[in-house]
Each structure stands twice: as structure tokens, then as C-alpha cells.
Amino acid sequence: MEPNGYRKERRKEQHLGRMNGGGGDVETDLDPWTAWAYKPRTISLLLIGACFLIWASGALDPDSTTSDDLVTSVKRGVWAMIAVFLAYSLLQAPSTVLIRPHPAIWRLVHGMAVIYLVALTFLLFQRRDDARQFMKFLHPDLGIELPEKSYGADCRIYVPDHPTNRFKNLYDTVFDEFFLAHIFGWWGKAILIRNQPLLWVLSIGFELLEVTFRHMLPNFNECWWDSIVLDILICNWFGIWAGMYTVRYFDGKTYEWVGISRQPNIIGKVKRTLGQFTPAHWDKDEWHPLQGPWRFIQVLTLCIIFLTVELNTFFLKFSLWIPPRNPVILYRLILWWLIAIPTTREYNSYLQDRKPVKKVGAFCWLSLGICIVELLICIKFGSGLYPTEMPLWVVTLWGSVGLGLVAFLLSWTWKIQKILAQKRR
């Protein structure tokens, strides 16, 4: 007799199998070479994990693992806690709508998101100086104040008096780490959102936010040609183009999956193995922001959250003294990208669901929670770090945008209600 959770999982996998073009039981459709990976072995893995804990903790030989260094013992204990929780998530966390390369991968990402949320909550309750020193436990180079680079100190493209390179300013900007970060970042966002107008709204919106907060962060103080030409027209455009090209490639592809063991040669087996890391089927994310006022607000909320997560990167980096090239920045971005993949799918499914009563998925909840706690950390640790007040013209501009948006939504709603009233007559 199967456990109740496994029966539910099998029914879900069978439903997904039928959606992908298969009509039979998933177990019969699985390739013999990979069928073992889809069979539950939770008890076996629990016992293996227990054996690993016995070895790592020295439970049977306490003297061999005794350490006089309290910090080392605490570090090992914390990493063991994280490993146990991730193992639980890998085996027992709720599955998502994604099944490639394996549902367990996304359960593991779910566990990583929970750990990140809990760690951020712990950091939120610390003092700013203590939090900065705490970052040393993540990387030994952290906890040291570093000067922030300003890109708008000299906006000349051609510097005739420079001794070695007359295009020094342009050279330094192009070969800065943020140049490639823009390209790969927008390629990843295009794969997530799959809507070119929405991507351009985000691209231009973030540049406007850089102008808004450049009095607070030196990184945002950019030259006009850096912000408009290099960022928007070159880096962001190329990243969006490459991402949408990837989207169109998978959208036009015919998905007829054949098992690895049934491939005729080694090349076919290698291609099929690599294909396991691509989507099982490609769904179009239809956002339709102009479908109605409420849908417009829902899509606008998605844009605001995306932009807030991006802003949090720079404010966290500034307040916690994390240099741009430190791997902690890269780890956070990779984790956020992994979290955003199922989050975007869940949110789009939520918008397209016609049920009167519905709720967002677990990843949507986690993403919003992480975004909020990151923002609270930026606000708390940023207190007193930004002595320059926001310019009056910036406040006036965004106030006007907010009032205009409210007026637009009210007018739109009034017109719809007027049309519906006429139809009832």
C-alpha cells in the first residue's frame, strides 16, 4: 500500500504526463535508465543521512571531534542544521509546477529559499555593526568598509590629457563587472517574464530608479551615455534580445521526448541527457496588463517586486560593506534566479486561473517574504548612512506619477462600469 503523499504525487505526475502528450501511467512511461530516480526512497535516504551525521558529529567517539574553538564548533553545527533541513526539503517539501530536471531539484530550491528567509530574519534583529561583522562568517574578506565607486565623476568620453588611454572613462565602464552583469541579468529576466514590452518597462524603470537614488548610492551616479547608451540601448537590449530569442526557440520546438536508453547512439544519449535540463513543455506566459484595471495592478505589482529586489542588491551591498566582486553577491543573485523561475510560473498560473477562490503558490509567498525582509534590512541598516535629502524635483516627479496612475485607474474603472451599465439596460 502506498503512502498517501506518494499517491498524491503519482496522481500529479500522471496528470503532468498527460499534459505533455502521454496518456499512460508515469511509471510505465519512464525510461528504465532513470526510473530509479523517481521512486521514493525516503526511509533509505534517512538512514544514510543518519549514518553521515554519526560520522560528522562524532556521536560514537566524542573525543575525536572535541574542539577547543567554539566558533568552529558553532559553524559546523549551523552547517549541519542547514544540511538536515535541505535533505528534508529534497525529500518531503511540496512539489512545484516544474518537473525538469527533476522535481526534487525544485524542492531543494524551496528549502534554500526558506533558509535564506530565516537567515535574513536573524540578520534583521542585529545591530548594523554586528551584522557587518557577522558577514565575515560567510566570507573572510567581508566586514571591512570599502569605498564605493562613482561612475559619474568624469563624464568625458574622450580625455585628451590622459597619458595612456584617451578613452579611459569609456574603457573602464565597458570592462566593469556590471557590464556583463547587465547582459546576463536581462537574458535571465527575459526567460522568466517572456514578454518584451514588460521587459522594457522594467529596463527603463530601473534606470529611472538609479536617477532617483543616485544621491544615496555612489554606484547610481552614472554619466548620461553610460545610463542611456551602454545600459539601456546596448547591454539591456542585447540581454533582452538574447533572452527572447531563447524563448522563441523553445516556443517553436516540438517536444517529443524519448528515453535515454532508447537513443540509437552515444551522441543521442548525450543530447537527451542534456535535454533533461530544458523544459518538458514550453508554456506561454500571457500577462495581458491591459485586460482590465485589476490585471494592470497585478502586473504592476510584479514589476514593483522585480525592481525592489534589484534595488535591494545595491542597498544591501552598501550597508553591509560587500564589494561588487565578492562571491556572496553572485550567490544571492543565483539563488534569486532559481527562486524566480517557479515564482514567475506560479504567479502567471495564478493570474490565468479562473477560479473565484484561489491563492498564490508557496514560491510566490516566499519570494514576497524575502523581498520584504531584505527591504526592512536596507531601511534599518541604512538609517544615518544617507545624509543627503532626496531632491525636490524627484519627489515632485514621483508624486505626479503616482497621482496620474491613480487618476488613470479610476478613469479606466469608471469607463468599464459605464459600459457594463449600458449593457444591462
UniProtKB/Swiss-Prot annotation:
GO biological process, alphabetically ordered: microsporogenesis; phosphatidylethanolamine biosynthetic process; phosphatidylserine biosynthetic process
Top-level taxon: Eukaryota
Keywords: Endoplasmic reticulum, Lipid biosynthesis, Lipid metabolism, Membrane, Nucleus, Phospholipid biosynthesis, Phospholipid metabolism, Transferase, Transmembrane, Transmembrane helix
Keyword Iron: no
GO molecular function, one term: L-serine-phosphatidylethanolamine phosphatidyltransferase activity
Known EC number: 2.7.8.8
Pfam family, one: PSS
Secretion signal, residue range per the UniProt entry: none
InterPro entries: PSS
Stretches the record annotates as Disordered: 1-23
Bilayer topology annotation: Multi-pass membrane protein
UniProt keyword Endoplasmic reticulum present: yes
Compartments where found: Endoplasmic reticulum membrane; Nucleus envelope
Transmembrane regions listed in the UniProt entry: 42-62, 79-99, 105-125, 197-217, 227-247, 296-316, 321-341, 361-381, 390-410
GO cellular component: endoplasmic reticulum membrane; nuclear membrane
Consequence of gene disruption: Mostly embryonic lethality with low frequencies of dwarf infertile plants.
Tissue: Expressed in trichomes, leaf veins and root vasculature.
Disulphide bond pairs: none
Bias-annotated ranges (Basic and acidic residues): 1-16
Top class in the EC scheme: transferase
Catalytic activity: a CDP-1,2-diacyl-sn-glycerol + L-serine = a 1,2-diacyl-sn-glycero-3-phospho-L-serine + CMP + H(+)
Main subcellular location: endoplasmic reticulum
Function of the molecule: Catalyzes a base-exchange reaction in which the polar head group of phosphatidylethanolamine (PE) or phosphatidylcholine (PC) is replaced by L-serine. Is essential for phosphatidylserine (PS) biosynthesis and PE seems to be the most plausible substrate. Plays an important role in microspore maturation.
Family of this protein: Belongs to the CDP-alcohol phosphatidyltransferase class-I family.
PANTHER family referenced in this protein's UniProt entry, alphabetically: PHOSPHATIDYLINOSITOL SYNTHASE, PHOSPHATIDYLSERINE SYNTHASE 2
Name of the protein this chain belongs to: CDP-diacylglycerol--serine O-phosphatidyltransferase 1
Organism, scientific name: Arabidopsis thaliana
